[in-house]
Amino acid sequence: MQRVAVMVLAVLLALFSAPPAWAIDPPVIDAGAVPPDETGPDQPTEQRKICATPTVMPNSNFADRPWANDYLRIQEAQKFATGAGVTVAVIDTGVNGSPRVPAEPGGDFVDAAGNGMSDCDAHGTMTAAIIGGRPSPTDGFVGMAPDVRLLSLRQTSVAFQPKGARQDPNDPNTTQTAGSIRSLARSVVHAANLGAQVINISEAACYKVTRRIDETSLGAAINYAVNVKGAVIVVAAGNTGQDCSQNPPPDPSVPSDPRGWREVQTIVSPAWYDPLVLTVGSIGQNGQPSNFSMSGPWVGAAAPGENLTSLGYDGQPVNATPGEDGPVPLNGTSFSAAYVSGLAALVKQRFPDLTPAQIINRITATARHPGGGVDNYVGAGVIDPVAALTWEIPDGPEKAPFRVKEVPPPVYIPPPDRGPITAVVIAGATLAFALGIGALARRALRRKQ
């Protein structure tokens, strides 16, 4: 009876101490799976929706500086760097260029005939403006790094859809809109090969941990851009809604997993490729994490993402998008990431010898840390551009630690030598024959006995 009780107790302990069925580990990179450097969509697309146009909230006053600029002390930071000489690639919905957002064509992965300089969603244009929008005497807006060189790569668009029926609406590789994990991987490689020193990806694909997606090419592309070409990659943490269900917080009773990898229920990509990428969450004007900002053990920093101001197609200030019931304020981790990409460009200009990992280290080490030093909503904290550009801190490791798929060395196979091989075959046949004769003899002896 005592043995049975011990066995029951052991089973109960195993049940309560075992990680959840969906527990995951950080992704593993297959460095040899880099996709080809090719533009164009995965399959032919067509436009099925009219283009969106950003708008303005009632009673807006653009003469004053946006709250995010003051919160981040952007004007003070620009005394130390403005992004001059740094190239930032914006992988997004494209950019409609203007004198205040003078982007250059970087490639189109939505329309085979495009070059990246057409934006039917406004998202890419507004993202690019927050990164590197130029100032104007008529309003108070200026981007984080107004002297950067902007490259526009159109990789997604809700206005375009692949021709024909979709195979799997739950797979980010077969989404209802133009753009996929595969085309994102190709766009990362293309941006890196164009010489981008900072790559902004204000996109997020969410899926449940119980339904794994093949991201081999994306992981390889990110590793290639960072560790081979030397680009800093900044990505959005993602917004809750649709496929993006909020992740639970870490379990304090499991100190061996302080960031809560075992609690993750929703994977966000490319956000979960931290620390190769810097994943950015959103805060509001009160400095608190935004309700819509996806959390996860991969979040590295945070920046303003609510009630923002940017520039529209014509280079004029906008702060809303059209909604069913009127204008909707400009919110989202997409724009939080844009602020951090701009800061990465400033750091790159001021400290040109730093590696991507060291630039990320400088941004996170000088951030306004939350209680406890780090959490899954704001990571190391809200960025502090002035501190990132002025504090004296250790550079940190040249490369970020990351799990890479180990490929065994090729096995040496000597050239064929017919003589020895023939001898071995003959000897083997002779041995087999001898063994066979011996077996027959033993059977005969047993029968006689």
Swiss-Prot record:
Ranges annotated as biased composition (Polar residues): 170-179
Matching PROSITE patterns: SUBTILASE (PS51892)
GO biological process terms held by the UniProt record: protein processing
Disulfide bond annotation, renumbered to this chain: 51-120, 206-244
Enzyme Commission numbers on file: 3.4.21.-
TM helices/strands, residue ranges: 421-441
A Gene Ontology cellular-component term: plasma membrane
Root EC class: hydrolase
Disruption-associated phenotype: Deletion mutant fails to secrete EsxA.
Peptidase S8 domain location: 66-389
UniProt signal peptide: 1-23
Database matches in InterPro entries: Peptidase_S8/S53_dom (IPR000209), Peptidase_S8/S53_dom_sf (IPR036852), Peptidase_S8_subtilisin-rel (IPR015500), T7SS_pept_S8A_mycosin (IPR023834)
GO molecular function: serine-type endopeptidase activity
Residues of the active site: 92 (charge relay system), 123 (charge relay system), 334 (charge relay system)
NCBIfam families: T7SS_mycosin (TIGR03921)
PANTHER family: NEUROENDOCRINE CONVERTASE 1, PROPROTEIN CONVERTASE SUBTILISIN/KEXIN-RELATED
Domain remarks in the Swiss-Prot or TrEMBL record: The N-terminal extension wraps intimately around the catalytic domain where, tethered by a disulfide bond, it forms additional interactions with a unique extended loop that protrudes from the catalytic core. It might contribute to the conformational stability of the active site cleft and surrounding regions.
Family statement drawn from the similarity comment of this UniProt entry: Belongs to the peptidase S8 family.
Functional summary from the UniProt entry: May play a dual role in regulation of ESX-1 secretion and virulence. Acts as a protease that cleaves EspB.
Protein name from the UniProt record: Mycosin-1
Species of the source: Mycolicibacterium smegmatis (strain ATCC 700084 / mc(2)155) (Mycobacterium smegmatis)
